[in-house]
């Protein structure tokens, strides 16, 4: 466990399976097959969300019949999860997952004192699984310095991978998430939840993220792209550090069909760009946070079609009467 080498990889797509929609381990296995069919590389399973969870019975069925690598999470209530039982039993479920060849085990930073025992358990069972140390931050995204401190604390545990999740109250907070990838010495999963945090998933490959999370068809999750859109509209496997970012600035923005129209056009002309929806609350703050050259141009929707003129270097006379307009940073 642990490495000082920065991993180079193509981003992996992780299906977030909301396990409370399934009433049996067999149905969870079916959900994993659905995730694979929709393009997922890995599946995250929340044991704390499984109704009437029986660790030995359910984990055996799930892990012995998995069609994809599995990340096991057993999130306690004190970290935003649903588990309220005995802490030792919670950790025992993770140890059992190790014995049954889980590919990734998630351990909260606050519970990192259990890592030596878990690592020894992995060695005793010849496990090749990886340990993810995670931290979920309540409230708005903290300042950059606080986030860096959390990253350093998680790295110091010796984890193979670290994971940091915040709640985005404003899209400009996501820039702090993107900046963390420059400082991390192990693979990092970092994103913000909620509709304003969507770009933290879609642009993760550009900045060096290890996972991108997606939702299954028929089970949308706020702030997560669907697995289908990752494959068909955004084609995140082609996004890299040189990718130019375009997007729709609007509030709300989930209705936009722009990604379906523009991203295929980029690919048709072999242009390294991505078009994403951007839920923006404050135009001035947004433009000062995401300047050129990486953020190259924007379409503007309601309620900013008139206000955006104040931020343009030049305005073509025809733009005054257009229903929507393209803003280009010069």
Kindly label every feature range from the protein language model.
Residues 17-23, 136-138, 165-168, 276-283:
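Short beta->alpha junction loops
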Residues 24-27, 143, 147, 173, ...:
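Structural motif
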Residues 3-145, 159:
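Active-site beta->alpha loop and helix N-cap motifs at the rims of alpha/beta catalytic domains
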Residues 243-330:
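Phosphate/diphosphate ligand-binding glycine-rich loop within oxidoreductases
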